[in-house]
Regions:
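A short acidic/small-residue loop/turn micro-motif
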Residues: 76-79
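Short, basic and Ser/Thr-rich N-terminal targeting/leader segments
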Residues: 54-58, 105
Length: 189
């Protein structure tokens, strides 16, 4: 299949697929751009798969605003014996590793359920631009995942909380804070 100039058509006809298709071409793969609903369905699908695999009913997806999935996560608390391995935290860890940064601004998270206080804190710390969720706190409470006591505890002074706490060696510990504060080449987060 030759063109008039004698060159092979594969070499001559080059198409800029990225400009005409809703996909992102990468070195090793083609990533489909998804709608917000498709991204949420992916998070829900992950939560269902996780239940089938013996895990909790939670899934999360981190994506670009254009709909490219960067990372996913499921609840791995029982599988990994890690009480912090919630779907959102797992997705944040995977995205940060994939992107090589702790700052996930410019990205959005889709989670099958409204985040618990820990995950909400992680979402803020990761600086994600927007959060979408399907099930809410009441839905989670109705199946045994009630976080209301944590929200209640956060409103109290440390001395009034159910978890006993005590300040120890503050004068020694503050030195690390002072050293970090004075450091000119620190990376703030």
């Amino acid at each position: 299949n030759q063109l008039g100039d004698g060159q092979n058509s594969r070499e001559t006809l080059k198409v800029d697929w990225e400009s005409i298709l809703p996909i992102k071409l990468t070195e090793n793969s083609i990533s489909c751009m998804m709608t917000k609903e498709e991204l949420m369905r992916k998070a829900i699908e992950l939560s269902k798969e996780n239940v089938a695999n013996g895990g909790g009913p939670f899934g999360a997806v981190i994506a670009t605003k254009e709909g490219e999935i960067i990372a996913t996560g499921v609840n791995r608390v029982t599988a990994s014996c890690d009480p912090t391995a919630h779907a959102e935290v797992s997705a944040i860890r995977a995205a940060a590793t994939e992107l090589g940064t702790f700052n996930l601004s410019g990205y959005e998270i889709y989670t099958s359920c409204e985040p618990c206080p820990m995950c909400l804190g992680a979402i803020y710390w990761a600086r994600l631009d927007k959060m979408y969720y399907a099930n809410n706190k009441t839905d989670a409470k109705n199946i045994g995942f009630d976080d209301s006591f944590i929200y209640d505890e956060l409103e109290l002074k440390p001395a009034d909380r159910k978890l006993p706490s005590e300040v120890l060696l503050h004068n020694e510990a503050i030195k690390a804070f002072e050293e970090w504060s004075a450091k000119e080449d620190k990376v703030e987060y």
